[in-house]
Amino acid sequence: PGATWTSGSTCEIIGYTCRYDKPDGKKDVLPFTWCKNIETGAEQFRWKGFAMPRPLYGLETINNRPAHPILIVEGEKTADAARKIFPNFNVVTWSGGAQASGKHDWSPVHGRSSTIWPDGDEPGINAAHEIYQALKNHCENIRLVPPPFMDGWDLADVTPDFDPKAYAKKSALPAAEYFAPAHTVIEHTEP
């Protein structure tokens, strides 16, 4: 694989996410998880998805640094990049792409100050909304950083001419405000 990420707690590895870059520029991201055969009892790693609810990638940082706020991004590659940019945050993500955010156990984030920084595309915004819905009754403070660019951009794409810390400081807003329904204009007609 071109990259591999480990999932589990600090003392128990439950699987890996493996990224294979294809010649056409696309990618395959495959889970390699610890499995138990219910018929034989045999245990081994297999090319199989994580059991649901799936664990978050970066979970160990939440447990090791309980006073640090949470930053939620999309994808392991982006999470690793975000950790370098925002070292005072516990950075977490989910596996399986934007459509899989609802298949994960978000309870480790409950009660924590959290910021969601979605990918700059429609699936990324939709995933951020789904995560916000999962957390809004469990976290006092949930903020969202609107994507600075809407072409699939994420924090792994930062270039020297863009300062993500300054942008986040200037642009972060309460997630409830970002996801509030647009104001509806009701036209009154004369009888």
For the regions a protein language model found, what residue spans apply to each?
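Intein modules and their embedded homing endonuclease domains
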Residues: 7-78, 177-191
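Short acidic, Pro/Gly- and aromatic-enriched capping/linker segments at domain boundaries
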Residues: 1-7
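TOPRIM fold recognition
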Residues: 23-28, 44, 61-70, 76-182
